[in-house]
Curated annotation (Swiss-Prot):
5-amino-6-(D-ribitylamino)uracil binds at F24, A58, F59, E60, V82, I83, I84, F115. The active site is at H90. This is 6,7-dimethyl-8-ribityllumazine synthase. It comes from Chlorobium limicola (strain DSM 245 / NBRC 103803 / 6330). Belongs to the DMRL synthase family. Keywords: Riboflavin biosynthesis, Transferase. The gene is ribH. Its EC number is 2.5.1.78.
Length: 155
C-alpha cells in the first residue's frame, strides 16, 4: 500500500498576497517587504498579485491581518514587522500578543497568515535577519504563505 502525501507547491501563480507590515522600525521592515516581494516574483508571481498594508506597530498587525483576511481580497496574508528588546517588559508583551494574534487570525479565518515578525534582542540581530547574514525572514514568510495556499487548494 502506498501512503498518500499531500503538500503545497512553491508557486506564487494565481495567489493574491497581502503584506501587512508594521511601520515601527520601518528601515528593517521595508527590507522584509522587499524580501517577500522578491520571493513572490521569483516563484512566478507578479506585482499585480501583491498589496502592501502598513500599520503603526506590531500590536496592530493582527487587527489589520484579520480585516484583510475577512475581506476576501487575499488568498494569503504575510505579517511583517520588527520587535527589538528594550529595557522594559514592553518587548515581551508586544511579542507575545502579536504572535498569538497573528496565529489566531489564521485559525479564525482559515486564510494562511504567515509570520514574518522579527523578535530580536538587538538591532544587529534584526538587520542580520532582514537580508544580511541570516537570510531574509520576509522571503521565508512568503515561501510559507505560498506553500500553505497551495496545500489548502488540495482539500
Amino acid at each position: 500500500m502506498q501512503i498518500k502525501q499531500i503538500e503545497g507547491s512553491l508557486s506564487a501563480k494565481d495567489i493574491r498576497f497581502a503584506l501587512v507590515v508594521s511601520r515601527f522600525n520601518d528601515f528593517i521592515g521595508q527590507k522584509l517587504v522587499e524580501g517577500a516581494i522578491d520571493c513572490i516574483l521569483r516563484h512566478g508571481g507578479s506585482e499585480e498579485q501583491i498589496t502592501v498594508y502598513r500599520c503603526p506597530g506590531a500590536f496592530e498587525l493582527p487587527m489589520v491581518a484579520k480585516k484583510v483576511a475577512m475581506s476576501g481580497s487575499a488568498d494569503a496574508v504575510i505579517a511583517l514587522g520588527v520587535i527589538i528588546r528594550g529595557s522594559t517588559p514592553h518587548f515581551d508583551v508586544i511579542a507575545a500578543e502579536a504572535t498569538k494574534g497573528i496565529a489566531q487570525v489564521s485559525l479564525d479565518t482559515m486564510i494562511p497568515v504567515s509570520f514574518g515578525v522579527l523578535t530580536t534582542e538587538n538591532l544587529e540581530q534584526a538587520i542580520e535577519r532582514a537580508g544580511t547574514k541570516a537570510g531574509n525572514k520576509g522571503f521565508d514568510a512568503a515561501m510559507t504563505a505560498m506553500e500553505m495556499v497551495n496545500l489548502y487548494r488540495q482539500f
